[in-house]
Amino acid sequence: MRKKALLVALLGGYFLGAQAVEVPIINESAIVQQASKIQGTVVDETGEPIIGVTIQVKGKPNLGTITDVDGNFSINVSPKDVLVISFIGFVTQEIKVGNQTSLRITLKEDSEVLDEVVVTAFGTGQKKESVVGSIQTVRPSDLKVPSSNLSNSFAGRLSGVIAYQRSGQPGSNGSDFYIRGISTLSGMTSPLIILDGVEVSSADLNALDPEIIEGFSILKDATATAMYGTRGANGVMIVTTKSGADSEKPIIGVRVETNITTPTQIPSFVDGYRYMELYNEAVTSEQTGNILYTQEQINNTRNGVNPYIWPNVDWYGSLFNDMAFNQKANFNIRGGTKKITYFMNVGVNHETGMLKNEASKYFSYKNNIDLMKYTFQNNIDFHMSKSSTISLHLNVQLNDLTQPNTSVGDLYGAVMNSNPVDFPIAYPADGVNNWVYWGAYAGGNDQGAVNPMASLTNGYQDIFESTVMANIDFEQKLDFLLKGLRFKALFSYKNYNKTTTMRSQGINRYTLTGYEQNPDGTYNMTISPFGSSNPTKPVLSTTSYVGGDRRIYFQSYLDYNQKFGNHNFNGMVLWNIDQYDSNAPTDLVASLPRRKMGFAGRASYDYAGRYLMEVNAGYNGSENFAKGHKWGFFPSVAVGWNVSQEAFFEPIKDIISSLKLRASYGLVGNDQLLDSSNQIIRFIYMSDITLQSDNASFTTGDKQQTTLNGPVYTRYQNNDLTWEVGEKLNVGFDMQLF
């Protein structure tokens, strides 16, 4: 059963304090003397109540209400009035009041209404029937999965999007994703992500709570992405957050969930004695070596005679838990008046990884993974007049992470490479030295093998990240100049900071060099430091790193939309500029601002919704090319035909309710080149010289036999470097059955 109200449950949410709100009556003359109160309930086709349905008296814009948490409403009407019942995603109904005093209204879902308006480039809305580009819309409800990262919900849900999760470690467990694969040989491969009109990172996307998302669109082909120029070469994801609502009483939503994380597959490990038997059997049958383990070792290990001389260590069970419990809570409030509307959301997420907190057994600190994430979203819209609106969007993200110095991947690898019988986790202390005698192995194939527990507990990291994004959006309708003309401007500022404090200490490892059995059956052991160095008391040292960046973005555009009979026209011209600065530059080039500027345009036409055509273009500048190549032009064109709008299609509309054919062709560009560490190389057309002060050296001579110190060319100047250009051809059809 598909519920329209959020579930009041551990994995659900609920609305509080939302009641039927009757809009104040401004024009009292609209109420006739026979007015009386009518009550009702609005439900979906499964009988579930629908919250927030608009009940409006037709022809009386000042008289209306919305349904409460139980789908109930009441409103003063006269017998001649007609009620208009509407809600996003459902077919609008009109009901004559007459002598009725109580109503039960069932709304039917309408897939065409759900997808009627598609968010296209730069957040402009366009009717789906007139879209000729390859654009997929995603319902926010489809993104509500028990995961702390939004990108983990992409896999298997979004056509044309490839998503895979590289790690399950909290703080690093977001998915990498591509739109229609990788479209460049040298540059960035991830898609452009736009949040409320501003470019953000995949980490910013992952931090979003699904509850704040109003719309989610994926732009795939050149026609859909051309206006973003080089930034959109790998596809574009456009996310818009919720706005406020004109309502006397606020609508409050709460969602609390707990989820359990477990590995998809845990390797099955044999006991130590069985490992030794299998090892001996393998070297015997393959004749690759001598039998390493004696029968006495195998028997003593099986019988647990002494766990230090004949260890039997379950390394995986010693380091990892079977599962982890994570908690998430979300609170939002929505409301406003005709002049000011608001939406606010606060989220808290607590994640713990699969690692055990073993360091507290040996030291005075914790080393397991513990992540606290705090998010805040506040959207305010000021409707200054019928034609002027100012919107303020504020997004804040705070991450507080504690984790071991050694990554989970490296620890897992150490567990896989350490057999259970070569050394114990640690030898017992002798009462002389106050440090841990970590086990090690000095002979055989595993000589010098890493002790996984020592790697886990040798220190920890505290990582604090903060992200603040603020947008100011201004919209002015210019109908007084030209009907259908609109001006819109956006200014955005983003600041990201990251502080990493690493605390680490040395590891003293020991190996078993001898033992003897006492008459009472106990054993005396002789252990020696592993390696040639003398052990010293480990001291916890501290190292700190600071990083981050900030970005300023501005865009403005004119948009024109008009209809003349069966002819529909739409056009847009846009200018934008973007500046990126590092908060902790490491060299001269990194300290220079990275600026981008571009122009974009779009023109579309359709005749009676049947024959469609759209032309887009982006014109972008780049710092990476010399004069004459700095600017790149990337156009696209698309055509479409709504076959189902033709008269000859009527006989089969009961079977195929909608059919549209479309095709597009365009160019996309890339101006980036990555180095071996996957960092963008700037000013790639210029020569790069490493000076003698940087310990540079070069070889010379007829046989390259002489090495001298001095300046070295690491890159030669090339004024002919230019854009990487790719062609995109898209042919498809959209069909809806029944």
Segments the model singles out, each with a brief description of its role:
Residues 290-314, 328-330, 415-449:
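Acidic, glycine-rich flexible loop segments
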Residues 1-376, 390:
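Short, small/polar-rich motifs associated with maturation and membrane association
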